[in-house]
Amino acid sequence: MGDGEMECFGPAAVYLRKTERERIEAQNTPFDAKTAFFVVDPDEMYLKGTLVSKEGGKATVKTHSGKTVTVKEDEIFPMNPPKFDKIEDMAMMTHLNEPAVLFNLKERYAAWMIYTYSGLFCVTVNPYKWLPVYDAVVVGGYRGKKRIEAPPHIFSISDNAYQFMLTDRENQSVLITGESGAGKTVNTKRVIQYFATVGAMSGPKKPEPVPGKMQGSLEDQIVAANPLLEAYGNAKTVRNDNSSRFGKFIRIHFGTTGKLASADIETYLLEKSRVTFQLSAERSYHIFYQLMTGHKPELLEALLITTNPYDYPMISQGEITVKSINDVEEFIATDTAIDILGFTADEKISIYKLTGAVMHHGNMKFKQKQREEQAEPDGTEVADKIAYLMGLNSADMLKALCFPRVKVGNEMVTKGQTVPQVNNAVSALSKSVYEKMFLWMVIRINEMLDTKQPRQFFIGVLDIAGFEIFDFNSLEQLCINFTNEKLQQFFNHHMFVLEQEEYKKEGIEWEFIDFGMDLAACIELIEKPMGIFSILEEECMFPKATDTSFKNKLHDQHLGKTAAFQKPKPAKGKAEAHFSLVHYAGTVDYNIVGWLDKNKDPLNDSVVQLYQKSSLKVLAFLYATHGAEAEGGGGKKGKKKGGSFQTVSALFRENLGKLMTNLRSTHPHFVRCLIPNESKTPGLMENYLVIHQLRCNGVLEGIRICRKGFPSRILYGDFKQRYKVLNASVIPEGQFIDNKKASEKLLGSIDVDHTQYKFGHTKVFFKAGLLGALEEMRDEKLALLVTMTQALCRGYVMRKEFVKMMERRESIYSIQYNIRSFMNVKHWPWMKLYFKIKPLLKSAETEKEMAAMKENYEKMKEDLTKALAKKKELEEKMVSLLQEKNDLQLQVTAESENLSDAEERCEGLIKSKIQLEAKLKETNERLEDEEEINAELTAKKRKLEDECSELKKDIDDLELTLAKVEKEKHATENKVKNLTEEMASQDESIAKLTKEKKALQEAHQQTLDDLQAEEDKVNTLTKAKTKLEQQVDDLEGSLEQEKKLRMDLERAKRKLEGDLKLAQESIMDLENEKQQSDEKIKKKDFEISQLLSKIEDEQSLGAQLQKKIKELQARIEELEEEIEAERAARAKVEKQRADLSRELEEISERLEEAGGATAAQIEMNKKREAEFQKMRRDLEESTLQHEATAAALRKEQADSVAELGEQIDNLQRVKQKLEKEKSEYKMEIDDLTSNMEAVAKAKANLEKMCRTLEDQLSEIKTKSDENVRQLNDMNAQRARLQTENGEFSRQLEEKEALVSQLTRGKQAYTQQIEELKRHIEEEVKAKNALAHAVQSARHDCDLLREQYEEEQEAKAELQRGMSKANSEVAQWRTKYETDAIQRTEELEEAKKKLAQRLQDAEESIEAVNSKCASLEKTKQRLQGEVEDLMIDVERANSLAANLDKKQRNFDKVLAEWKQKYEESQAELEGAQKEARSLSTELFKMKNSYEEALDHLETLKRENKNLQQEISDLTEQLGETGKSIHELEKAKKTVESEKSEIQTALEEAEGTLEHEESKILRVQLELNQVKSEIDRKLAEKDEEMEQIKRNSQRVIDSMQSTLDSEVRSRNDALRVKKKMEGDLNEMEIQLSHANRQAAEAQKQLRNVQGQLKDAQLHLDEAVRGQEDMKEQVAMVERRNSLMQAEIEELRAALEQTERGRKVAEQELVDASERVGLLHSQNTSLINTKKKLEADLVQVQGEVDDAVQEARNAEEKAKKAITDAAMMAEELKKEQDTSAHLERMKKNLEVTVKDLQHRLDEAESLAMKGGKKQLQKLESRVRELEAEVEAEQRRGADAVKGVRKYERRVKELTYQTEEDKKNVIRLQDLVDKLQLKVKVYKRQAEEAEEQTNTHLSRYRKVQHELEEAQERADVAESQVNKLRAKSRDAGKSKDEE
């Protein structure tokens, strides 16, 4: 395409292709192919350079920047010639390598040519700027052009897909992949834009809009779907401001003519986690920030949101604005798109509400309840907003979040949630709502885009994330990478299929390679059974599965077994990885943390159930199918694993499978998007980043595949034309030669590798690089040719110039000669005459020419006029022809349209014809059936008449019964009137209750359901009527009778409908009556709750009030239990409704609700009553309507009865139905009567209960009045005791809490003691049973001895039989010798054979004798070993039973041999049996399967040797082979059992690890409890300080009362003595406890001895193994409880220690204040009181600790005993195994001897005939069966040994733990004793200080008395002086 052709692209041309001048300049650039190379560089990855030298595998290159580097030869890559610079298809390059691809993309990107082809790929680089390459001009430029005709562009890919679809009639797909920010979404938009434009152009004008369907054209809708999907599916990421966080597959459907028909969208892998979490440089989905722009203020109010994103933490964790995005404009586009796509106004506001609710979810807060782990809401404001937006009840939602109901077994249980669990549930719900809403919007968009226009083909556009390799790769990355792996496999397969199809078409020999299989290992590792996804889904099924167990399963299954699965190498600074996968793009390390939770994606089912009942229709629709999916997994998906739910991975695989199926059914086109740099800088390309993407997105993979084949190809003509210069002599001149032959000759004559090219039918194919070499050779040849041509041309030019010079010289010579001659003759006279005549001759000729020209002119003028006239005529004809042509074109277009319409109509007619034919056939068949039935029914007509009369009688009975029901209804109506009057008096209390509205709505809904049921009945009758009208021809003879019957039945129906109405009214009355009674109960309950609140407020006043309140609470609980009992009774009544018929089901439900109305149906008021009346009126109106409908039906029936002649069959069915209805009505009436009676009884019971409740409430009122009076009395006491009670009440609570804890501990220990006693009793019973078993075993041993003696006797008989056999052998020998003399020469050979056999028999008999002797020794040795084995009673027991069976078989065999066979053969048979039984014992003990196989192979070889001598043994060998096969099967079975045992052992180890993790969790909880106790103790210390300050104030106020201090001193002395006495008692108790512990140890030792005896019975121990496991678990639980109680005791001790320190501090303060005696004495008294309380507490703690120590010692000793017994058993098993090993070695020798004897015996036995051989074979099979049984028993024994070994290890570990616990308890007791001693010493010191203070006190008191005496003396003196002064004054006055 030249520059002129590129002008059609307008301004975009310069961004699409280089100009011709640039291309020519590039080709003329100097280039040396031998030295131009790319070189590896650590900074830039690759650099251009010039090769300097190559030596020893090293290459020296000088880069263009002047730097010289030396690298390995494989680190340099050849450059392509300049003609390939900026090449549009990189697959055409000569040298296909990474740097060539990189620099080609880089140079094109620098010129802003962002699109480049790479084989089948179109690679696009993000320009980060706007380029004018998407205008309408560009769309038109690409339309209809082939790929090679236009520059690379996304429009070219789109147009090719469109044209392929039209020409090939095949669906197409465009696969667009790349990393985030690479431009996938933009290119997807451009593809859709192109299809929308082209599809709209190819069709006629826009169709008429369908009313109510959509707004805007289909093209507008397809384009408008993007803004909505982007708002809800796009977000800002680190690399991209508008990153699609989901994959999508958009199908654009076209009609047959290429017209755009419809579209639909499928989405994949929406990133839900972004809703609740964003990185710092990212933000959540655009819609959240668009809503908060404030563009629509009414939305802010409707959604209860603000314009500040930081008010919503869930969406403001990262950035909140994006520079490149205007949220206001985007919001306008989103809102407009919703309207264009046809969403209704309700749906639109629902979408916004749910979006706002998701934002509010992040503001919900929860806190932990005090002293509990249970979460509770921290405020309900946010919950109220969410509930409003989602159409829920906020209280129900919070309850469901904090207390969800879960299914445990078959019951629903309420479960408490912690704060983290609730927060996780809230996050999961918000993500689920957002995801479901997004998927619903996609479905709605698809519905709107489905225009119902005819569509034939589609083009799919896949926009999905590319391969991802991050530092932290999780499940999402695995899904994305797996998707890309599948897509790359699809591409590889498709690409090389196309390549190889071309090879096949061109006839090139090529072995097919499926490059899709290159990725099979990784794909199968992920998706096949026992792959990663399979194991992940399997782990999700197990409730106790963890990430660790998942990792272990992965490693066990694949590590070391699958090459693609590797163990990651730990790297510094990177996240931990658990496994690595080898993908086509590289090895990726995956972290599996949280995969199980992500895969299960759990939701709070309680909240989901609320969603399903939401008043917001969209939300209810989103979760409508959630319950069904959770319960059954869907009907169609029942085959899936688990069945109960569908995991994320399973759903992902299902969607991926559908996607791949879609893609495989299409012709794909591939687009790969690249990010040039991380900084979003236009024009900059980072080499490392681009190469990484090229590897990830498969471009380099495609190049790799290209290099496998022949990527370069040229047509033969082009090749011949271009490369003919290489050897022109091969192609002869002047004669025709085929281009292919010429190319073959040309290539054959050139010095190149002839394996690097192939010849096709039309092209020659080259391997990568060969074409470049040919180009180099051509350049060199052209250089030589040009040089030669230049030389030839120069020579030719010079020769031509020389010739011209010579000719010029000759001309000059000739001119000079002529001029000289003229000068000589010009003056001659004749010459002058010639000069005069010459002009005259010329003028005459001119006149003649002029005359001729005039004639020509006239002639031409006439021709011109004729031509003009003819031209005019032709023009007129042309105009008319053009007009006709246009008319014909219009007719052709109209005819083509008519033809297409006719074809469509023809197709429709054909389809309708087929359907009508099928219907006709069905109708004919049905007509035949109806005729047969009619013939039968004419005979049954008379029976119908009789039955109709019976029906009339039954209807009369029904009328009587209904009359009774109507009377009862009037009675209930009167009751209702009375009850409604009582309801009016209680309106005020009823007004407070708001829940009645919901109940009323439910009742209304039920009434509507009743109405619907009646309408269904009417519909049923209508259908029956239509059937009757269709079947009317055969009933004309019985018209009147059938008419009367129908009228009677209709009357009965009307009566029944009236009864139904009456029954419904009676139900309503009963409901009102019940509600009134329940209302009273509710009122009383409300009063009770008020009383309870008052009583709880006054609980702190004293123990008496608390007791009374507890009594009231107990009474209330009794009342609640009675209410619950009443509810249970009502539930029982409800169950009785299940037996009613289907048509009266609604009536029975109402009756049951009357018997079981819930508490929500209590309060009724006048408004509700009015609604009830309205409902009744509606019901009456509906009944009237039904009656009118029924009357209309009857009228229609009466009109159509005249035509009912031929339909006797239908009447028969009607009769049967009526009979059924009659029986049902009878049953219903009986049930109604019984239900009415039951309701009446229930009503009477309820009234009685109400009266009793009222009496009880009146009693409670009186009691509450008394309580109030007592409270008033106590208020006065409270004022006096406020200060003391405030302090001591807290202490009392603490002590009570401590006492309750100690009491619980004591109860727990008591239960443990009882359990231990019970276990001891069980062990004693087991011991007795074992003793009995020992006795029976001894008895069996005696029997075995007797059997052994009998066996010795049998052995002697065998020896006698053997001697007899020897004599018989001698006789046979002599007999054969004599016969040999008499026989002829023909039998000579047979005689020799028999003699040889006799000799062999003698040798075998001798060997048998020696083996018998050795067997006897073996038996003696085995007897000694049997006596040794008698120690193990259990093994001896089983062995005795086995030997008993074998002995009986042995006796039978002996008897048969005595009767039928020679005694020598009997001896051999017995030896054989005994040898085989010994070998089975050996197999049993050692599980030696391999030796058994060797043994059988030896048998097979020896039998083959015998076959050479005796041909009759062939059958026996076959049987032996079969037995070997069976034994091999047995071996495989045992090996499978072994693997099962191994898996069981691994599961047990996993369980042990799980239990250890539980112990760690318990210890962590204990630490938390300990910290909590420390905190509480700190609070108690503060309270102690407060008490101390209060005591100080009291002391200051009592300084004046010295006498009371004396009394207090005496009290202190008494307290001291009491404390000393208590301490002595505690010491005595401690010594008693120690003695009791010693006694318990003795008892434990006795029990240990008993248990040792009991453990001798092995079978009993095996049966008790499970019990022991349970005991271990119980011991562990008890240990955990003990540890918790020990921590509590420690906390209490620490508290006591703090109290002691406080006391010491107070004593120091007292010593400092020597002058304040009263305060010091008082503090000492307080300290003594506190110490006394502490001592009492310590005494209780010591008792508990001692008890704990006893229990722990008992457990430890029991565990030690168990461990010792298990160790002893293990040792015995080991001894037994060693003993059996020795037996095995001895028996191996014996087995070999016996085997030899067996072979010889078999050879002898063959002489006895085939009959004997068959018996031997049957015996062999029996023995082989015994071998298998013994092998199974051996395997069981090995299992038992392993179990006991594990048990010994567990008990040893438990023993060590118990020992540690005992040591800790002993240390605790010692510490307590030390503390008691310290307290004693402190008391003595306090006593000494008290004495010192008393002495000082006495001294001061004595000084005070002296001062008082001095004061008295002074006072007396003063009085005297006053008296004197008064006397003196009086004397003065008198004077």
Swiss-Prot record:
Region listing for Hinge, in residue ranges: 812-839
Polar residues bias: start-end ranges: 1592-1603
Stretches assigned to coiled coil: 840-1935
Gene Ontology CC annotations of this record: myofibril; myosin filament; myosin II complex
GO biological process, one term: system development
Residue span, IQ domain: 782-811
GO molecular function, one term: microfilament motor activity
SMART domains: MYSc (SM00242)
N6,N6,N6-trimethyllysine carried by residues: 129
Classification via InterPro entries: Kinesin_motor_dom_sf, Myosin_head_motor_dom-like, Myosin_N, Myosin_S1_N, Myosin_tail, P-loop_NTPase, XRCC4-like_C
Family annotation (PROSITE patterns): IQ, MYOSIN_MOTOR, SH3_LIKE
Annotated stretches, region: Actin-binding: 659-681, 761-775
Top-level taxon: Eukaryota
Role according to the record: Muscle contraction.
Name the UniProt record assigns to this protein: Myosin heavy chain, fast skeletal muscle
Source organism: Cyprinus carpio
